[in-house]
């Protein structure tokens, strides 16, 4: 039985980094050239944005009098942007290289706009 990925994409290595698809690796190469040309700056990959913080039980006082943090009831919900960079006008751009738009992605895209006021650019 062959181990295949759900949407048929293959991990690709480019300049020492591993990307989730050929399309994402090609975009990384394009952004690298744009950065070298001075058109963009501060290119970052896999930047985490917390959409909903983790939910915890209330803190309690421990046996020795210290504050004991409550245990996690629900883990945080986070979005990882494929690329974040500054354009030539000084604006921050958040990009996602999309092949197939899953329901989870669509919800996270809407939460990014609602929580952080950031519109994701889809490539």
Predicted regions, residues:
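Electrostatic, structured charged patches in enzyme active sites and in nucleic-acid/phosphate-binding
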Residues: 1-123
């Amino acid at each position: 039985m062959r181990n295949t990925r759900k949407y048929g994409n293959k991990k690709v290595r480019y300049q020492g980094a591993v990307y989730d698809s050929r399309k994402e690796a090609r975009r990384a190469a394009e952004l690298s050239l744009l950065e070298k040309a001075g058109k963009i700056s501060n290119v970052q990959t896999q930047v985490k944005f917390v959409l909903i913080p983790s939910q915890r039980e209330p803190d309690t006082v421990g046996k020795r009098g210290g504050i004991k943090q409550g245990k996690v009831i629900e883990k945080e919900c986070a979005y990882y942007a494929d690329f974040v960079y500054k354009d030539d006008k000084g604006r921050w751009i958040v990009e996602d290289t999309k092949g197939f738009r899953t329901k989870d992605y669509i919800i996270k895209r809407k939460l990014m706009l609602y929580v952080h006021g950031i519109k994701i650019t889809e490539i």
